[in-house]
Structures are given as structure tokens and as C-alpha cells.
Amino acid sequence: MSILDKIVATKQQELAALPVTAVTVDSLRAQVAARGGVRDFMAALAEPRAGDVGLIAEVKKASPSAGIIRPDFDPVQIAQEYETAGASCLSVLTDEQYFQGSPEYLRQIREAVDVPLLRKDFVIDARQIAEAIEWGADAVLLIVAILDDDRLREFHDLAVGAGLSALVEVHDAEELARAKALEAPLIGVNNRDLKTFTVDLDTTGKLAAELDLSQTLLVAESGIHTRADVELLQASGARAILVGESLMRQENIAAKVRELGGQTVHGEGGHE
């Protein structure tokens, strides 16, 4: 059983303990209205606040592949540093067992920053989209590898219908074909194989060649450590990047945000 299979099995157990509730576009829209609306996640990536790439900076304490990434973990402080440094959006891990995330982190960060937020988790049930709104997310991650076509379309329609952005994540050509069938405007290519957790940055370029990039905002995810990595991915067609581990390992998070985002090259930090 792969790590991904284990994570999904755990999610199924967690969801089995929750009350059964119907989730509709109308119920989700009512939730969004009650909390005061949505920050536009996709628009924030298309028009970066700083630098030359839409940067989704991830708040992540641990992962199955890396273990504890940041022992001195203060999610709100990290989120505020990301925002101040110019990140376009934030990704917040809410999975507790495998990534040491928490719904509370998302709630707290919602109150502390003004940029759009992604609930980073393994969505296999419509109730998780309702949770995402309740906890403060403006976008949800839909991982094609763990959803059949019917659920993928259902969850995409629910999220987008409610006004959220849906980041549809793929890793290979077969998954990309399924995402394209949705006409998803926001597609993430995960350079990490979630079955083996190995990373290959060339994955983004290979799959980007199959996309109409005038109709799709492409996000490159995983394995991004240097500005050279970012420029390689931009040349492949990525307009945005999602970065977690390499930011979390920095003593000076803000400087790394500026470096990856291109601010130290094109922006005010030109002499750094």
C-alpha cells in the first residue's frame, strides 16, 4: 500500500465519524455569504503582488517523506512573514495524522492575513469542501489520483459554484487528460509522485506541452528549491508555483520568498 493509499484510508475513517450532511452549491454559497465572501485565489496568482510568478507559500510542519520539517512551528507568524514578503497566496495543511496540520491553523491564519488561502488536504468527500469554507479557505485542492471522474467533476462543480477556486492536481498524462475533460482553469502539476514520493521537475514541462496555456493557469508544485528551478518551470509554461518544504527549512523565510518570486532579480531587492 502506497503512502497515498494509507492517507486516503485514514481520511475515510475520519469521515465515517462525521455526521452525514447533504452538500449542495446553494448550501456552500450560503456558507460563503455568511462568512463574508471569498478572496480570489486564482486572480491573485494571475497578477502576483510582487515578483514575476504567482507564489503559493505553504504552511507545513511535517510530511510523510521528510518527517518534521520545521520544529519551531508558529503557523500564524509564518503566514504573516509570507504575506509581508510578497507571497500571492498561502497553502495551509489541515491533515493532522500525516502532515501535523490542523483546521485551527487555517482558522487562525484567516484572521491574521489578507491573502487568499488554500486548504491543503486530501478531499474525497463533499463535506470536506464545506469544512474548507467553514475554516476559512478560498480554494480547495482536488487530487485527480484519488478521485474517480464523477467525484472529480462533482467536487469541482461544487467548489467553483460556491465561488472557490479549485486547484486540480495531476502528476501524469492520464491524470492531465481527466483534468482537461473538466475544462479546469487552474491545474497544478505535482513534480512529486505521490505513490513513491520521488521528485522530477521535468514533469511540469512534459505535461505543460499538452495544455492550452492561454486557457489554463498552470501551477508547478513540489521540488522547487532555487530561483533557477523557478525559471526552468516558468520557461515550461508555469505561471505560478507552490512551495512548502524549501521555505519551511529557511531561517530567513522572507528572503527565500523574495528570491523564489523573482523580487531580488527584478524588484526592489536588486542589490541583495
Q: What do the predicted segments below correspond to?
A:
Residues 10, 58-62, 95, 122, ...:
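Active-site beta-loop-alpha junctions enriched in small/polar residues
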Residues 2-70:
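An N-cap/entry alpha-helix motif that binds or orients negatively charged groups
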Residues 12, 86-87, 137, 184, ...:
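A structural motif
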Residues 131-151, 188-197, 238-256:
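Glycine-rich phosphate-binding active-site loops on the catalytic face of alpha/beta enzymes
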Residues 206-210, 249-272:
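C-terminal helical cap(s) of enzyme catalytic domains, especially alpha/beta-barrels
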Residues 186-243:
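Catalytic-face loop-and-helix region of soluble metabolic enzyme cores
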Residues 53-54, 59, 65-167, 175-178, ...:
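N-terminal active-site wall of soluble small-molecule enzyme domains
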Residues 124-135, 171-182, 220, 224-243:
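Catalytic cores of alpha/beta
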